[in-house]
Amino acid sequence: MPKREDIKKVLLIGSGPITIGQAAEFDFSGSQACRSLKEEGIKVVLVNSNPATIMTDPEMADSVYIEPLDAKIVEKIIEKERPDGIIAGIGGQTGLNITSELAEKGVFEKYGVEILGTPVEAIKNTEDRELFKETMLRIGEKVPLSRAVNSLKEAEDVVDELGLPLIVRPAYTLGGAGGGIARTKEELLEITERGLRRSRINQVLIEESVLGWAEIEYEVMRDENDTCIVICNMENIDPMGVHTGESAVVAPSQTLSDAEHQMLRSASIKIIRALKIEGGCNIQYALKEGDYRVVEVNPRVSRSSALASKATGYPIARVTAKIAIGMKLDEIINNVTKSTPASFEPALDYVITKIPRWPFDKFTTADKTLTTAMKSTGEVMAIGRTIEESLLKAFKSLDIDNQLGNKHWDEPETKTLLKTPTSERLFVIFDALEKGMSVKEIFELSSINPFFISKIKRIVDMEKRIRAEELTPELLREAKKMGFPDTRLAELTGSTRQEISDLRHKAGILATFKMVDTCAAEFEAATPYYYSTYEDSCETNATTDKKKILILGAGPIRIGQGIEFDYCTVHAVTALREEGIETHIINNNPETVSTDFDTSDKLFFEPLTLEYVMNVIEREKPDGVLVQFGGQTSVNLAIPLKQELKRRTDLNTVILGTDPDDMDLAEDREKFYILMKELGVPQPEGGYATSHKEAIEVAKRIGFPVLVRPSYVLGGRAMEIVYDEIDLERYMKEAVRVSHEHPILIDDFLEAASEIDVDAVCDQKDVIIGAIMEHIEEAGVHSGDSACVIPPQSLSPEVLDQVRDYTRKIALALKVKGLINIQMAEKCGKVYVLEANPRSSRTIPFVSKSVGIPLAKIAAKVIAGHSLKSLGYTDEPKPKHVSIKEVLLPFDKLPGADPVLGPEMKSTGEVMGIDYDFGRAYYKAELAADNVLPLTGKVFLSIRNADKTELVDVAKKLQAAGLELMGTEGTVNYLARHGVFMDVVKKVHDGSPNVIDMMRRDEVDLIINTPTSKQSRRDGSRIRRAAVDFKVPYITTMQAAIAAAAAIETMKKGEELTIKSINEYHKEMEN
């Protein structure tokens, strides 16, 4: 039966901002679904709040709404667009929750919208923990003993019934949010309280512990005809007790017997049929010695399905979208082979390993223990012929300093860390084996299958051989087959990476490339992708006559380097393909659009290091390499890559775009300072130091407070505002460790300055400014954590002219070819340049969506040889609407972290609010970031003295809008002197009843708390942490409070929010 003819227009709900538990995998699946529906001639309406996604590009759907993912707003879009159907399972947990809410309210019935694919009943039967348990038991499938509870009293009763430890799983939440493992009654009550608040239906499931059992996942697909296939099975290296998003995962499963595989395969098909899921679905099992329990089912595209897609080459989201419009598996052609139907089960002749990337370098106070709730921000995937090879390649892909064998622990610490899962457990296993601990001992402490421990032992044993023996060509070949990178071999033999590389080439030990083709080479692949290994035959050939360009991707999503850089990579690829250039990508992130099978002409799933990039260059011999689109990861490779290409006279590949030496000039603060002086561009006074003594001298010369940071960092890592000598000494002790022989930079901190961001494209003759952004938070909050607005709201025309002038001067002086981002600050009408980055920036997608011009695409075309004039870009765009970028902070997923902003970046993702005035746009942005500004209720104020003069106006606006105010004594007395009267609430350290008690009773609707001295900072920290834990909107800077008051004032005037697609906003700009 072909596709349904009655479905002409479909609504897709995206997943919103990148957050812990929901990363870029839904951009990848959403983009694939959009293309899949459009192939069938169906009109697509898309709603998503995240501008950094490919799926929100105006050309991805017929109408793209960048609006808050809020049920009321989605209802207005349905009313306006009148779609025939909605597909819920593409937008992750967010999409499912909104679909369920709209169905319950009767919205679909009211507007005649059909839920396509997986029915709401199936969503309920999987997401509602009690219904799920009943369904499984009805079909004879075993689940852990459990009880669904709606209150703390009910939770207490479960302890007597099931004993401890217990697992807590909230209903309808994301990445296990709000859940955890309770080993005591106190822990159970604490986790249950958190879980009930997080759950959409105020329900958590408390279940018996299956800690230590193996965790196995099956990715299954079903169509309306009841045809089912198993796409992939995966095995978690960590046993049950660690969320699958937090565990290292291998595919296919390695320790299952054939009988166990057949048993779980049959159960998977039985489950997907019983639940009547149509499309892709993920089923998780706990397994122990032939016995199993069904842990959970995700009736949607998920993180695991993104991994399964990349592991097998099977486009799960594409097929799911086609099934949703009535197509059958045997009617859908597999796009990788172009000849086999989607009903063929994929076959793998390689091993993949996924390892998560955690943000603990940014959150030193956060609890690093891994549990059933996620804490990682992203992940890498590596492909090899063996587990050892794919594991070593995965570690190399993480882009972290710490590699296997580089870190050591003493014996008591080793035993503790083996028992407790943390982000370092695999490193600890390596160290324990190196010190002689047996596989059996490690298994008994960690419950990790001895099979995996013995594989790590093989790597340890090989390292011992390399240290002890001469590195002969035979041993070198053996080590390379096992996955050892040249850098590690150099460390083990006391030589350099270059010497190892030369030794390899001399012995003819070169990387070969194998294909991922969904069918273990049984059929010819039309759009294959590749991984490197050390075998005899090579499956890639470099035969075309077309010009070839290799683009370096951004690697795993982490704080400071998010999905924005994948967006830039994909845009660059698209632009070059439009020019008839053959494009190749190297990347290792399974969640992204750039690693989709048909984004580029060739995809190489490899670590982003010099060795692996050179392997591809040697094999493919591209004309050029692009490094400016993949964020700091690819920029860091620019100089070493340029040097290596210069050394290799047999290669004619060059780095395209801005010259790496000019990029380096911008990164090197001293050289950049000299250049700015020559151009007559003001900078904050600064200096650099390599010792404590020098640092104190520089700071005294400039005067405290100063901004200190290491050179060459991403996302403000180890950046701080320092107020006195003691603080500076502590910083020097901590920061020198992360600075790699580079000096510490010390700048005058411009207090109370407005920060400005500019994104521009330069072709070495002309410069086009995409937008000037004004930050809402003042200087001192990392630009990646500040909300910003286009067009600027408070900067004078004279200041804006200075900004434009400096942008042009700097771009031309740095000989930029492509993108440049410049950060500036304005104080008392004078503009200072803080830094320039001649590469893609995290604001490129936001600017492109806001002003309607694709900056990354334009930059790629400039690099390919076009001038800005020939492309028709000469004037800075002037939008008629206001766009606000707001960030999403991950504090709710990281117990223990203080939710305060500073110069080190902490946000994981972003949202965008668009309307015709600042107030409505800001209200939308906060709504989209799940920091909903209240229009009624109580506001608690506790403000440091320095901010109190600005507070009066804010307090008056809030009171005039009908909100009730309360605060601590100092704030109350100050406001009373200025005619604003409110109730006094005790400080936290003065005992109860205080604001935390009120939050617990749901008596506070907004917290405005700016941090100050150490004692109050402790109080403030507890208030802010409680606001996160009790889901109370909170504000920690005065500038955000001023913006919030303006938004609340606008909304109270009864102004309607504008519901328009970005396609419509962009059209208005053309007129």
UniProtKB/Swiss-Prot annotation:
Mn(2+) 4 binds at residues 835, 837. PROSITE patterns: ATP_GRASP, CPSASE_1, CPSASE_2, MGS. Binds 4 Mg(2+) or Mn(2+) ions per subunit. Pathway: Amino-acid biosynthesis; L-arginine biosynthesis; carbamoyl phosphate from bicarbonate: step 1/1; Pyrimidine metabolism; UMP biosynthesis via de novo pathway; (S)-dihydroorotate from bicarbonate: step 1/3. GO terms for cellular component: cytoplasm. Large subunit of the glutamine-dependent carbamoyl phosphate synthetase (CPSase). CPSase catalyzes the formation of carbamoyl phosphate from the ammonia moiety of glutamine, carbonate, and phosphate donated by ATP, constituting the first step of 2 biosynthetic pathways, one leading to arginine and/or urea and the other to pyrimidine nucleotides. The large subunit is composed of 2 ATP-grasp domains that are involved in binding the 2 ATP molecules needed for carbamoyl phosphate synthesis. The N-terminal ATP-grasp domain (referred to as the carboxyphosphate synthetic component) catalyzes the ATP-dependent phosphorylation of hydrogencarbonate to carboxyphosphate and the subsequent nucleophilic attack by ammonia to form a carbamate intermediate. This is Carbamoyl phosphate synthase large chain. It comes from Methanosarcina barkeri (strain Fusaro / DSM 804). The lineage of its organism: Archaea, Methanobacteriati, Methanobacteriota, Stenosarchaea group, Methanomicrobia.
